[in-house]
UniProtKB/Swiss-Prot annotation:
Origin organism lineage: Bacteria, Pseudomonadati, Pseudomonadota, Alphaproteobacteria, Hyphomicrobiales
Subcellular location: Cell inner membrane
Transmembrane segments: 5-25
HAMAP family given in the database record: ATP_synth_b_bprime
A single cellular component GO annotation: plasma membrane
Gene from which this protein is expressed: atpF1
Function of the molecule: F(1)F(0) ATP synthase produces ATP from ADP in the presence of a proton or sodium gradient. F-type ATPases consist of two structural domains, F(1) containing the extramembraneous catalytic core and F(0) containing the membrane proton channel, linked together by a central stalk and a peripheral stalk. During catalysis, ATP synthesis in the catalytic domain of F(1) is coupled via a rotary mechanism of the central stalk subunits to proton translocation. Component of the F(0) channel, it forms part of the peripheral stalk, linking F(1) to F(0).
NCBIfam families listed in its UniProt record: PRK09173.1
Full protein name: ATP synthase subunit b 1
Amino acid sequence: MEFHFDATFFAFVGLILFLALVVYLKVPGMMARSLDDRADQIRNELAEAKRLREEAQHLLAEYQRKRKEAEAEAAHIVAAAEREAEMLTAEAKKKTEEFVANRTALSEQKIKQAEADAMKAVRSAAVDLAIAAAETVLAKKADGKVQSELFGNAVGQVKTRLN
């Protein structure tokens, strides 16, 4: 049996020695551990990403709920403001109508009072004129006896009216 020590043989021996050295230094275990660590790290990152995604979805749902609540509250506030504005408008209209009615009634009352005062003044002036005319007529036509009798009758009428 003859051995040929050519380059192929030495390459094979080198390969065997290299593999023995790799096994002796526990390189496959270190590689497996490194790959396991990397797999664990990736698994943890995926779990963290899933947790963050769920948290983001929860926050999104919460913000959407809060937005809907805020929109509902804003709609409620707007509706309340509209109702209050309508009430204030109706109240202002009612007060304005009452004010106009009061002013109209007061003006009508003043007009009636002015008419009554004018009628009294006209009557008083007519009475004064009639008295003056009667006095003038009586002064010209009546003598002393008739004047005394008229004066007595007038005083008697005044006494009866005062009592």
